[in-house]
Swiss-Prot record:
Recorded name of the encoding gene: priA
Keyword Metal-binding (UniProt): yes
Organism annotation: Rickettsia felis (strain ATCC VR-1525 / URRWXCal2) (Rickettsia azadi)
Official protein name in the record: Replication restart protein PriA
Segments passing through the bilayer: none
Domain Helicase ATP-binding stretches: 131-297
Domain of life: Bacteria
GO biological process: DNA recombination; DNA replication initiation; DNA replication, synthesis of primer; double-strand break repair
Co-factor binding comment: Binds 2 zinc ions per subunit.
Amino acid sequence: MRIAKILLPAAKLFPLDYLIPESLVLNIGDLVIVPFRSKELTGIVWEFATIPEASKLKTVKEKVPLDLSITSEVLELIKWLSSYYMSELGSIAKLVLPIDIAEKPIKVKEQKVNNSFVLPDLSEEQKQAVTILNESNKPTLIKGVTGSGKTEIYFHLIADYLVKGKQVLIMLPEIALSTQIINRFIERFGFEPIIWNSSVTKAQKKMILRGILSDKVKVVIGARSSLFLPFKNLGLVVIDEEHDDSYKQDDGILYNARDTAIVRGTFDKAQIVLCSATPSIETMYNIEIGKYQLVTLVNRYNNVDLPNIEIIDMTKEKLSKNSYLSKILIEAIKDNLDNKKQVLLFLNRRGYAPLMLCKACGHRFTCKFCSSWMVVHKATKKLECHHCGYQSKIFSSCPECLEDETLTICGPGIERIEEEAKALFPENKIAVISKDHAKNPERIAQLLHQMENLEIDILIGTQMITKGYHFPNLTLVGVIDADLGSNNADLRASERTFQLLHQVGGRAGRGDGKGVVYLQSYYPDNIIFSYVKAGDEDSFFANELEIRKSADMPPFSKTASVILSGSNESKILEIARAMVRIAPKANVKILGPASSLMSKLAGKYRYRILIIADKKFNLQKYLKFWLSLIKIPSFCHLKIDIDPKSFY
């Protein structure tokens, strides 16, 4: 008897067997409605089989309306993801079909594309870049200084693919970036792109998915999960700010959206374009070995000068109490404001202060569920853990020694810088942009609109503000703590610091007026600053590659982390040690177990085992065999992170 194996979008499910009614003609990839437990679900026809007896099997009910189906390329992507990231097929299918689209009737989202586009003239350098991209048959990086017009280049590519009737995906690391790109897109192409992110409602998702499956949606701008959308006719994949760590998913299925999007584009035979002013080490290495192609833009659009970068030695600054802005920076801000120019102050730390402690007994306020300090939030009068979200009141006395008036706060957060700026410049309009102050795309769009219309004089921001924004009247950037993050033990600490400082500095001087960037540092001789000041990313990349090579770390090797967690620390450590003891002999290096940098998270103690192997070694096959040798108790949660980006 002929049956269909149906892949349902549900965690930990493999394809299930269903009888095929004689009246129903099915093909691989068809979307069908099947009974599952007490309800009906939409599933994907995965494969067919013949069995001798099928009396206990349930029957496929029907195809979904409009005979919608998943392409063979998307099916290949599901298989690849499951194999590479060692995840269940059902979990991957849920990324492709995050909601049930079988309900009817439902309006289909359709974009009306008019091929008479209004595209601005390109510079000679940009025209050469477009020519190279048109001739390229491999993933291509557009590497250009901040403000060089990388977006306009891929807009010209989009125009070509729209004329061909193809679908286009533009990926951004955070959808907060989308506001300015959406406005520019509408101005250029005359219709609104579809936005795909976590804020899209269930009803909107159904409409969008139907539109994509029926090829009526042509352009999508989205965050990580947009790469799984079931495009029928994908022609171009753009991965903007390709270096950004936000492309790595750190919960659920631990995948890298940039890398997966490149695989997706390869399966679909789509052109793949990566963009960044500060590309990742991995991408630069792939260019070096000929796997990717490079297009370089050395000039800003309209030949606008790059900003000057000045380093302020904070060891020589005499700051007044509760002050974090140097006299040099304060004077520069005054001059800038007097000239009717805008200022950006950058500190990658949310809240008012990162730590509260008792001066009498030394007690530090830490999260009861995590191994992290509680951050002081003066605006909400709360202490908050930025890892699990736990909150408590701000105490008036020490809960440890019970002394009064002994509590003090240490270090600045973004709210503290706002307080200082308002005291120094009371007549000026000051705004803050961070995850606490701009919790939805609408609020972010409002702040950006105010900035563009010169309704804000000083914008104070976290990492959110470093990515791709264009403010022509902004000529001064002040980095409050340029040392933050550069001195930790993370493999990628130097890379992240260089990228962050280069990107935030690139917000200055993009219109009229020379830009200047001030980096406040207690370690002014840090070699990273010399690379940033000189704008010499090539030397930085070369130096970083040498360090990675000598340490046998990516991109010269492949790595995986096994993360074990649970509420009983000693038992979790015991299981981790047992795993290492029975590890199969192979040409791999095993480090650990060691406590994670975040040793306790949401009440669970965490230990890591790091596996380092040769680039050609089948790490997934090795891990599967290793895990088959040990039974993990139910109280221990095990995760595998292929190609880990961090070790928190």
